[in-house]
């Protein structure tokens, strides 16, 4: 992500999440060498993005969002593939995330990409309160 996409990512955060990241938090990620935000642009706007933080050989997906009007076009899957390739290139051995237990479309995508459910975080989300499924994928070496 570059400075030019901050506004679009902020808008997408507000569209997709009940507790969106602030513009300040997103700007701080620009200066974080361990953070990588990969944006997809369509029709002149940020159509989707994925955020990843890498720490000691592990990649953690912090955010995945695709604008409702651009869903079902492969944008999320392409960003996920790009995030995985980058994590492997930088030496990560696994990638992990949390997803709402009720988010069946997202869970299906992650399973298609080789993620496995490895645990649950009770009441992880609010508005509405919901458990998170923890999903992890180990990279072949």
What are these regions (language model features)?
Residues 70-71, 111-113, 118, 129, ...:
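ABC family nucleotide-binding domain
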């Amino acid at each position: 992500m570059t400075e030019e996409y901050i506004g679009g990512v902020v808008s997408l955060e507000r569209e997709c999440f009940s507790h969106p990241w602030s513009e300040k938090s997103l700007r701080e990620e620009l200066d974080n060498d361990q953070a990588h935000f990969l944006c997809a642009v369509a029709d002149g706007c940020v159509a989707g993005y994925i955020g990843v933080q890498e720490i000691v050989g592990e990649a953690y997906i912090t955010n995945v969002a695709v604008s409702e009007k651009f869903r079902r076009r492969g944008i999320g899957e392409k960003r996920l593939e790009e995030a995985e390739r980058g994590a492997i290139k930088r030496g990560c051995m696994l990638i992990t995330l949390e997803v709402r237990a009720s988010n069946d479309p997202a869970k299906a995508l992650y399973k298609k990409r080789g993620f496995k459910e490895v645990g649950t975080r009770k009441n992880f989300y609010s508005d509405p309160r919901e458990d998170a499924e923890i999903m992890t994928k180990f990279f072949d070496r």
